[in-house]
């Protein structure tokens, strides 16, 4: 299952995409933008399925109950857990993300290693060594650039930590997650069970 549409084009057989929606912080237009991007990839992937996961409750809970500097890493770990659960339900064998080294604080080697630790399935990162211009060039080539730059918010641009940790310690992260207790697990399970399925063709 793919968490990245450009990354999906690099792994051409992928036909399942996941989008994390956090209304009211993210709008219907943001969801439709992702649907439109998936449509633009149909030429390469064939018909595909988009899973829209309601992520507001887990995201708010992490924001309100974890240290601000750890918010980004904790959020991304929870997103990978959810993607892992969706993929396992569909009997898929891997996750695909669009991360590239050093583009943002959550994509340092240390952050990626700590994020990866929660995932049972392999995580493929076809854009890992690409810089921003490389990724822009790919999106221009496959015809998704104009849609991708539409200025609609996504769940990764809300509740942004002022000074996110760039070299997270796994033990510290796990300690913070224990303080989130079973509530966050229940929220993630509900997010998976109530995900909206959109067939894209």
Question: How would you label these PLM feature ranges?
Answer:
Residues 1-12:
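Single conserved hydrophobic/aromatic residue that forms the stacking wall/gate
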Residues 53-58, 100-101, 153-162:
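A glycine-rich phosphate-binding loop feature that marks nucleotide/adenosyl-phosphate handling sites
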Residues 9, 48, 92, 108, ...:
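Peripheral terminal appendages
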Residues 22, 98-99, 148-151:
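Short secondary-structure boundary segments
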Residues 41, 55, 59-137, 141-142, ...:
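Active-site adenylate/phosphate-handling loop in enzymes that bind or generate adenylated species
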Residues 2-4, 17, 34, 135:
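Extended, hydrophobic alpha-helical segments in both membrane/secreted and soluble proteins
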Residues 13-57:
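Cysteine-dependent PTP/DSP-like catalytic domain, specifically the C-terminal lobe
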Residues 15-18, 124-125, 148:
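Short hydrophobic alpha-helical runs that function as membrane-insertion/retention elements
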């Amino acid at each position: 299952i793919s968490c990245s549409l450009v990354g999906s084009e690099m792994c051409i057989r992928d036909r399942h995409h996941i989008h994390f929606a956090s209304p009211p912080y993210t709008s219907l237009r943001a969801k439709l933008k992702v649907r439109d991007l998936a449509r633009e990839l149909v030429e390469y992937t064939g018909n595909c399925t988009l899973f829209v996961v309601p992520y507001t409750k887990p995201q708010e809970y992490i924001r309100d109950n974890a240290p601000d500097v750890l918010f980004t890493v904790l959020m991304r770990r929870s997103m990978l857990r959810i993607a892992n659960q969706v993929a396992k339900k569909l009997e898929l064998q891997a996750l695909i993300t669009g991360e590239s080294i050093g583009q943002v604080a959550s994509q340092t080697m240390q952050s990626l290693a700590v994020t990866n630790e929660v995932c049972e399935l392999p995580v493929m990162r076809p854009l890992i060594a690409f810089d921003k211009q490389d990724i822009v060039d790919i999106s221009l080539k496959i015809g998704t650039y104009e849609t991708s730059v539409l200025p609609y918010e996504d769940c990764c641009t809300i509740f942004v930590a002022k000074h996110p940790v760039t070299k997270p310690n796994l033990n510290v992260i796990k300690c913070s997650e224990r303080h989130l207790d079973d509530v966050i697990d229940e929220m993630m399970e509900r997010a998976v069970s109530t995900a909206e399925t959109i067939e894209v063709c």
